Amino acid sequence: YTMCVPHPPLIIPEIGQGEEKTISNTIQSYESIMKYVSTLPIETVIVISPHAIAYSDYIHISPGIHASGDFSQFHAGNVRIEVDYDTELVKKITQSAKKHQIFAGTLGKDDDLDHGTMIPLYFLNKYLKDYKVVRIGISGLSPLTHYRFGQCIKEAVRDKNVLLIASGDLSHCLKEDGPYGYKEEGPLFDHDIITAWKNSDFMRFLTFDPLFIEAASECGLRSFQIMAGALDQKKIKPNFYSYEGPFGVGYGICGFEICGEDLTRDIGNQYKKKMQEEVKKIKEHEDDYVRLA
């Protein structure tokens, strides 16, 4: 099972101090989806977080055996999360990435758990206790590389019962009084993501215009790209829970159930072919100008 979830710090009552009631739909959805997945035979939870360590040219997988973190950054240091890492699965994902020439692994520094990791686990821990974790960051690499890395995860988890959580808020510019003010790209981006979730249209995660993405001030897209790769050639049933953005940031929750194989959903290869065709068209167009010159 996989899911896309947001990570607003104020959803934690000790941080929100009552303000969290404004996003009650998100809280109810979080409770519902985590309650549901707790009935599944989960051994390991993979969390992809935009707030874990991020490099421009390398996807970081947290090393070590154990990690912890708290919300002292948000004045709630008493709320603490501890995890044991699935070192065996970390090794398998790293090996798969190396085999497929994706720059990913456990090199570099590590730090305490980030809020993009802890908030989903805060809700999961209410219903499920005995599991290990793999924590993965995002990078400045291309959309297709994030998708291909997701395929490495898929290869590595073949014989394992895994829950994959793609942590990420949507646009941060939905309202004038939001963190980045209002930009028209914000609601448009959120609409496109919600539609893509509802239709399991993972190609959409790869095809956004980079300037549009920058203007939308989004957070979760690369997490979703990795998740999409992990579901490559899988038959998917989407379970959309909720969407709201009262503070000017989009919070959406959607789960994806795997219902078997679907070889037509080789979205990475379809995207690559699409890009090659576009480059070919541009080149042909350039050739016309060269001839005219």
Protein language model regions, located:
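Structural motif
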Residues: 44-46, 163
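Acidic/histidine-rich, metal-coordinating catalytic segments
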Residues: 164-173
